[in-house]
Amino acid sequence: MTVIPASARIHPSSVIEDGAVIGENVTIGPFCHVGSKVVLGDGAEFLSHVVLTGKTVVGKNSRIFPNAVIGGEPQSIHHSGEETTLTIGDNCTMREGVTINCGTVEGGGHTVVGSNNLFLANSHVAHDCQLGNHIILSNNVMLAGHVKIGDRAILGGGSAVHQFTRIGRQAFIGGLSACSYDVIPYGMLNGNPGLLGGLNVVGMTRAGVERATIHRVRKAYKALFDEEGAIREKAAAIREEFADCAEVIEILDFIVAESDRALSSPFRGKS
């Protein structure tokens, strides 16, 4: 049985299915639908015409705008109605028309969105995506299934990300780009096909990365992408030189990690 706290404000036109968990100070505006397995954190706000379905958790103080559909079944031909989940962290904002799907059994069953994220209008997060914190998805961004995105990454409007692609921490994807391969932490990718275009120096500076550190990351980037040789071999060759630079080590670890996709590079073709 659903217990609605006295502090919650729910418009009489909205439907709250029996079994839903409503936190303190939750606001649910007109014509929303909250499914029976949905959990809404304290202080969350749903403006109007929001559909919350599936086995979905929305964190504290998150705001979801009209016509968003959160926790829908995965758009996968392999899905046969199994119960899978979606978890969204605290302080997230999902603007008009955002869609986020639950996971699939094949993908582990869980779609996860971290905290303090901003998803702008009509952006889509497909099944089994794993997103960190402080991420911005601009209008009409499309994430295919199983995509992984690190903290503080920014994706420009209309960009599309291929399934199983990894996007590293604080990377920047330009508007209308086609991101088909993994993007290193702090990398910038633009175009269709998407090509690596250097480092997100502006983002690094805003995040408080020291100028000397940025210089070292630039030096490592040149060694990785301007010199001849296989990328993994080059990553191994420079590891000792940059052992004291956490940002470079993060990039090197990303390069050698297991992945279903190749690595984005500054030139056409796979790296």
From Swiss-Prot:
It comes from the Bacteria. InterPro entries: Acetyltransf_C, Acetyltransf_C_sf, Hexapep, Lipid_A_LpxA, Trimer_LpxA-like_sf. It is an enzyme of class 2 (transferase). Gene3D superfamilies: Hexapeptide repeat proteins, Udp N-acetylglucosamine O-acyltransferase, C-terminal domain. Belongs to the transferase hexapeptide repeat family. LpxA subfamily. Involved in the biosynthesis of lipid A, a phosphorylated glycolipid that anchors the lipopolysaccharide to the outer membrane of the cell. GO terms for cellular component: cytoplasm; membrane. Signal peptide: none annotated. This is Acyl-[acyl-carrier-protein]--UDP-N-acetylglucosamine O-acyltransferase.
